[in-house]
Amino acid sequence: MWFSWNNTEQSIAVRQGYQVLAEYQLIEQEQLKNIYAIPSYASALHWFGVIFIHSGFYAGSMFRFSIILPDNFPNGTSLPTIIFTTTCYHPHIRPQTQSLDLAPFFTGWRKDHYHVWHLLKYIQAIFADPEGSISTTVTPSGDRVCLEEAYNMDALAMLSNDRVAFIKKVQELALFTKKHMYDKPTSNDPHYIVIEPFCSERHTKIMEQLKSPSWKEATSMDTSPPAQCLARIDSSRQMDEEEAKQSAKLFAKNGKAAAALQ
């Protein structure tokens, strides 16, 4: 009996592993700019993520975050948990825990409707258009009607009533994230996203390796996952335009922003 139960658990774990791998492949297909996420080596349900912001109120910021998928993912309706490991000041991020409120745009998880990449686009959108993220509707005169409650009421009030003060505060945090961008990794997980200063010589060497037949042959076999993800920081106009394009239509003027995630 024990053997049978153990086999069942193994079968469920293997199936879930393939489903999570499919989620990661979907992210690659979406080709999102300036945001990266990868399952940790220790657990397929714990993802590491990082976002670089090049425009808007949060320009110059770099935020790390974790995505915790429910134990029964992708089944069930429980939403994943997103926790920022870099301090963020935003109406939708709880200051005590740095957890992100998904409720404004996700009423519940539906595996046939949502994927992990939707979470990443949502993260991009709240930073690209923080004012749009707290707007419930727009009046005929063009005025925004803001939420009455949010995870961070102080940030909500400041963004609604004093944009200049809000921008100043988040820009102070942006400088802090720049200062600590290359800090020593806080996790020894092989899949932790390591950020290093751009080195043209190293970049050229890696690109040549990727083009070599031996590299293509080695990576065509699913024997072992990559040990590191190296993110190149590029603040060029092209990346800014791509980032803006990703989130421009996410928040609809009529307040039904969730439709943009479909």
From Swiss-Prot:
Gene3D superfamilies: Ubiquitin Conjugating Enzyme (3.10.110.10). It holds the Pfam family UQ_con. Transmembrane segments: none annotated. Residues 15-179 form the UBC core domain. It comes from the Eukaryota. Signal peptide: none annotated. Belongs to the ubiquitin-conjugating enzyme family. FTS subfamily. This is Protein crossbronx-like. It comes from Drosophila pseudoobscura pseudoobscura.
